[in-house]
Amino acid sequence: MSDKNKYNQTLFLPKTSFSMRAKLPEQEPKTIKFWNEISLLEKLKKQANGKEKFVLHDGPPYANGPIHMGTATNKILKDIINRTMLIEGYNVLFVPGWDCHGLPIEWQIEKKIRNKGKNKDDIPIKEFRQECRNFANKWIEEQKKSFIRVFVMADWKEAYLTMDYEAEATILEEFAKFFLNGSVYRGYKPVMWSPVEKTALAEAEIEYKNIDSSSIYVLFKIEESKNSDFNNANILIWTTTPWTIPGNRGLAFGKELNYCLLELQDSENKEIKGKKIVIASNLVEAVTKTCGIEQYKVLKSFKGKELESIICRHPFENDGYDFEVPLLEANFVDDKEGTGIVHIAPCYGEDDYNLGIENNIKIEDIVEDNGIYKENTPLFAGLHVFKANDVVIKELKARDSLVGVKSYNHSYPHSWRSKKPIIFRTTPQWFISLEKNSLREKAIRSINQTKWIPSSSKNRIESMVVNRPDWCVSRQRSWGVPITIFINKKTKEPLKDKNVMDKIIEDVKKYGSDVWIAGDPYKYLGDDYDPNDYEVVKDILDVWFDSGSTHAFVLEKKNLKWPADLYLEGTDQHRGFFQSSLLEACGTRDTAPYKAVITHGFVLDSNGRKMSKSLGNVVSPEDIIKRSGADVLRLWAALTDYSEDMRIGDEILDNLNDYYRRIRNTFRFILGNIGEQSLPKCIDYNDLEEIDKYILARIYNFHKKRSEAISDFSFHNFYKALFEFCSVDLSAFYFDISKDALYCEGKNSKKRNAKTTILFYLYDFLASWYSPILCHTMEEVWKLFKTQNCESVHLKPYPSINEKWKDDDLLRKWDKLKLIRKAVNSLIEKARSEKKIGSSLELEVYIDTADKEVEKILRNTDMKEICIISGFNLETYDENIKNVLAFEEVGAIKMKIWISKSVNGICLRCWQRCKEINNKNDLCNRCSKVINDVKNISKKDT
C-alpha cells in the first residue's frame, strides 16, 4: 500500500446502498405495489380518523382519451396539496371523479357508427347510449391507471362518475330545485350553435381561432324619410358574415354619433357612381379608401337622431325579401370600425335579437339545425351558410348593392370538439334565469366571500358573472341527463308537479336516465294527467350542469365536507367548472360550494407555444415517465409557478433530471454518514458548534416558509429555495466543511456526533418536506433508514421543531461569513486554475480588515474549518509580503485577502498541513489519537 493510501481504512468514509442510479421508470411501479401490499391508503385513513377534515374537490376530467400534460399537472398539483395537508395532521378526503356525458363522447360513437356505413338514427337510442357508456368506462380505467402511475393518492374505489345512476338522479334533483322555484324557463334566444354537431354549445365548449372572412359593404336603399335630404339616398353597412344578409330585418345607428351624407363622384366601382350614402363621419376616410371611392362630396353632416323613423328596402327586394327594414337606435353602435351603422339579423346575434324584441321585429329563423338555409329561403335554399358567402356577394353585386369587399382576419368561435366554426342562432332553449331568485346577486356575493388564488382570478370570474346572459342548460343531443319536463300542448306551459318529478328521480336512481330517454316517460304522469295533453321534452342537460352539481352528490352524499376547502383547476374553468358550480350551488344553497379556488395556467412547450400534433411539440406525461420517472414529473410541477402558463420540453427536463440528481445526492451523503443500522447519538443544542446551529436555524426558517406556502398553497418558491439549500448550502457548504469531522474525527467524538446530529435532523425534515413530491424516492430512503417505527414514509408524522433553533442574529452572522468564504474560494479557484495548487489544504489564508465587527467574527470562528485550508491569519497587508499566490480586495466587506502555500508538514490521514507532525507515522496529533483509540478499542474487544 502506498503512503498516500496507507490510512484509508482508518477513515470513517460514507457507506450506503442508496445508489445514485435511481432507475425511476423501473423502480417506481415496485413502490406502488408495496403501497398496495401494506394497504397504505387504509392505514392513512385510520391514522387520520377523527381529525379535522380537509377536502379538495376534484373537478372531473373528461373520460374520452388518455391523459395529457394538462390533466396530469392538475392531478399532481392536487396530490401535492393533499399529501402536504395530510402531513399537517388533517383528515384528507380526496374522491376523484370523471365527467362522462356530452358531445365529445357522442362524437366518437357517431364516428364509429359512420365507419360501419350507418348513421346514428339507424341505432336504437338505448344501444347508442350504452355504446357511449362503454366508451367512457374504457377511458376511465385507462386514465385511472395513469393517475395512479404518477402517484395520485385517492379513494379510487369511491370515485364518482357523472353517469352513475345515483349521480344522474342527484343532477335531476338539483335541476328540479331550479325548475320548481320558477328559475327555469323556455326561451327563444340566440345561442352559440354548432351546425356540425347540431346542438347549442356553452362558452366553455368554444375555442377561438383567427380566420379570414369576406367583409362586405352593402347598400340599403332609403324608402321612407321625414327629411327630404335623404330622398334617393342609401344606408351603407358593413358585415363580416355575408350569409346573414338574407336574415336582415333592420339597421342600427347611434343616436349621438356624428354622421354625414356623401355623394359618390368617382369610384373604381362605376355602378355606384352618383349614389348618395349615409356613413359615420369618423369612418369616411377608412371606408372610401377600402372601397376604392376616389372622389366624393359631403352633402350634409348631422347627428344620428336624424336617422330615426327612416325605412329602407332589403337589397334582395322583389326576390322574396319584400319587407321594410327600419333604422333602430341602439347603444351598442360605435364609430370605431365598419360604417357606424350595423346590419341587424335578429336570429343570428344577441344584440340583434334584443334590439329586434325591443322593437317588435319578427324573429324568423331561416337556417336548419345543420347550417343549411331552409327550403323557403328565397335565392339561397339548400345552401350551407358557410358556402353561401360568395353567392350572397354575387347577388348583391348583380343588384348594384355591393360597394366593396375586403378580406378580414379576425378571431372567430369554433367548437372545441369538431374544430369547425359555429354560428349564433336563435332557437327555443331552456334557460336558468340569473335574475329570478337573485341568482346573479348571490353568485357575486359568494365570489367576494371566496379566497381566489391568484387574487387576479377573482376579477375575472366576477366580470364573467356580472356580464353573462342567462344559463342555457338545454342541448339537442342524446348522451346526457334528460330534461324531464312535460309541456302542455294547449297552454305550452311546463308541468310543475313535484310528485311527478320525484317519481322520475326515484326511477333514475334505480335504473338510470334511460328510463326517460329510451323508456316510456308518460307513465310518470300517473292518473292525475292525460298523456294526450302533453308532449315530452327531448333535450338533455348541459354537461356543465352535470359537473356543476358534483358538490351535491360528492361533497354531501359521500359524507365529505360542504363547502369544500378548495377547488383547483385550469384557468379555462372560470367559464366552466368554477362558474357552473358557483351558479348551481348559489341557486340551490345560496352560497358557493368552495371556500378557496386555485387557478393554474396551461402547459405549453419550452418556447411558450400551445402543444399540438401539427406542430410536433406534444410532450406526454407517459413519455416523461418512461424517460425520467414520475418523481421528476412531480418535481417539475412543484418547482413551476402554476399561477402562470407552465413550460416543459427536453431542455427543461434535462435540467430537472439534474435537479433530481442533486437532491438524491443530498440524501446519499446523509445516509452514508449517519449509517443505516441505528439512530445516531444526538448532541444537545447547547453543545453544538455555531455552524451546526446555523443549519438548525435554516431548518427552522424553512419550517416557517413551508407554513407560509401552505397558507396560500404556493409551493414553488418554497421548493425552489429548498433545492438551492440542498445543492448550495448543504452540498457545497455544510457537507463539504463537515467531511473532515465525519471522516477523520473519532467515531464517537463530540465533534463527529454533532455533525451526525445535524444530518439526522436534516434527514427527518427533508424526508417530510420532499415526500409530497418525490413520493417514490422518499419511500426508497425511508426503507433504508427509519427515524420512527412506520412502514412507509407517508405514515411518518411531521418532526417537531425546537424554538431554540430560531436565531436570526446567527443567520446574519453566517451570511456574512459565507460571503467571506466565497471571496476566499475565488482566490483558491484562481490558484487551482493556474495550477499553482492541487488542494485547498495546501494553503494558508490571510485577511486584513478595517471592519471591527468582521474582525471580531473572524477571530471567533474556525476559518481553517470553514474554508477547508491549513492555516488562517489576521494580518496587516504589505505589498512586500513574499510568496503570495493570489490577492483580492473586497470592497463590500472592507477587507484584503491573500493566500500562500503552507510550509508545514502533511498529515497522511487528513491531508492537513500541521506544525506538529509525528515523524514515525506522518500523522497530526488529532489523527494519531484517533488511531490509538481505535487500536485500544480493538484490544479490549479481543
For every predicted segment, state its role:
Residues 331-333, 359-371, 477-479, 498-645:
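Alpha-helical recognition segments enriched in aromatics with Gly/Pro capping
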Residues 46-109, 171, 237-239, 243-244, ...:
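N-terminal catalytic cores of NTP/NDP-binding nucleotidyl/phosphoryl-transfer enzymes
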Residues 99, 191, 195, 201-209, ...:
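Acidic, turn-prone loop/beta-hairpin segments
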Residues 202, 534-535, 912-918, 932:
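Short functional micro-motifs and their immediate structural scaffolds
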Residues 246, 250, 257-344, 350:
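Protease-associated
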Residues 194, 415, 488, 526-530, ...:
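Short cysteine-rich clusters marking metal-coordination/redox-active sites
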Residues 2-17, 21-24, 30, 34-38, ...:
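Residue patterns forming the tRNA-binding/recognition surfaces of aminoacyl-tRNA synthetases
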Residues 925-937:
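Short Cys/His-rich micro-motifs in 6-15 aa windows
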